Amino acid sequence: MLSRLFRFLTAAVIFGLAWSTFVEASEPGLPQATRAPVGGEASIPYGWVDFCNRHSEECTLGKLKPMDVRLTKQSWKILNEINNKVNNAIEPISNLDHWGTTLDHWDYPVDGKGDCKIYALFKRKLLIDRGFPRQALLMTIVRDLNGEGHAVLTVKTDHGDFVLDNLSDEIRPWTATGYQFYKRQAQDDPNVWLSLGGATGSAPGTAASN
């Protein structure tokens, strides 16, 4: 059974505007980013396969039409709202301490705890619940500033690719993270992962640990 935190947070952040209320023409004064270079197919993370075994509804969608988020002041506000709420609501804990295994366990924060994958998956779920196109919300594997494996959520927009990260309450262009980007989900199929070739953004001023 889902925890009270999970149910409450889910209900709280999906309440409000539907997607149709903020798909508008782009507005001035919004952030800009570039698009990460995407290569050929990459291996599928074990954690995603395991997640799909427990949440088949997320993984049996068939081919999807690629879509980007239309960035407006309202959609940017919602992205920041969800990024901050999730970052502050989940208690960080390592995969080993949480699940007692070194195998990556991907899931939602059913007990209010989790590591980077749990943060990213929950943000993805809540944004989908708010009407954002799932094709633009891509689980992404990187190496962080300490050279450790890390998962973030890439949001593809008409202003470029932005990163929602449990290590930062600021949503940043992918090039501003300092991370090495290795692979992420394809827009047309969440079960296909594409290589990012270890592309690296310019390092920000401060480091953070996973």
Segment roles from a protein language model:
Residues L9-W19:
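Bacterial N-terminal signal peptides
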